[in-house]
């Protein structure tokens, strides 16, 4: 059954070892932030540093694993029809919009959506790690300068992942304008198996 995360919203759910998660961009150019926690000990969580280190690339896609802070495999990426994801940048937060966009008012954020949906699992704001940003198109120049460009994902693109342990998953439809080419759209997901 395909479920929808409305624009600028989030969801959290459990995934059993061996189950598959399909994250779908139904309209194109929409990022989805994903965080993972060990369902039996939430101190173990997805780690950008360990993943980039062990996979020896900053371009995480089909054939790669997402690793935990305890050096355990959490998910394997089985399929990725877009091929461009980010694992460098933190989930957008209220502070992101104040510091980077000079936004003085309230703005929805992935960080808030992750925390709001994960708090029923006992996960606190300080527990939220760097997210695996599905469909996010971060470019980097030779001098190290980063830029967030419009996603390359088209309507119907998806990433299929398989759980390597029992997981708690946090997932969003990203709230940052620059990450989504200036518009906000839903994200679909499906749990298989």
What are these regions (language model features)?
Residues 1-193:
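Acidic, Ser/Thr/Pro
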